[in-house]
Amino acid sequence: MADMSSSTTTIEAPADEVRAVLFDIQSYPSWSSAIKSVEVHEKDDQGRPTKLTIKVEAGVLKDRATLSYDWSKAPEEVPFSLDEADMMTEMDGRYLIKDNGDDTTTVTYSLGTSLAMPVPDMMRRKVEMSTIEQTIAQLKQKLEG
C-alpha cells in the first residue's frame, strides 16, 4: 500500500446526502475537475461499482487508472485500490464519512500514489495533497452550493 496523505473537512449536509454524492462514482466528472471520465466494468449486488476505469488529470499527472472499490465497510468507509494504470504503479485511497448527528458530516479523504517514473517524494506528496484538497473543496461546494 502506498504511503497516504489525507485531509478532513466538515460539510454542512446530512451524511445520507454526502454518501449519495460520493457513492455515485459515475457522476464524479460533473463535480470533480480531476476526474475526466468514469467507465464502470463491474458492480456489486447493490449496483455499486466494484471495478472501474477513470481518466484523471491532477496537476501534471494525466493517467488512466483501473480501480477496485471495496464496499464492505460502507457506509462509513469506502476504500479503493489500483489494479492497473499507465503512469501510476500504486494508488490507494479511501473516504471516511462520519455523521455528526446535527445535519453536518465530517469527510476524510486519504490518497497515496507511486509513479512508474522517478519523482521526488516531496513533489509526489504535493500533487497528492493538491488533489485531495481540491476534491474535498469541490465535494463541499457540490453539497453546500
Name each model feature, range by range.
Residues 1-47:
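Hydrophobic ligand-binding cavity/cleft-lining segments
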Residues 4-6, 62-66, 89-93:
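Short, surface-exposed coil-to-beta transition loops
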Residues 14, 45-47, 74, 100-104:
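Short strand-connecting beta-turns/loops that link adjacent beta-strands
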Residues 29, 39-86, 134-145:
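Glycine-rich portal/gate segments that line the openings of hydrophobic small-molecule binding cavities
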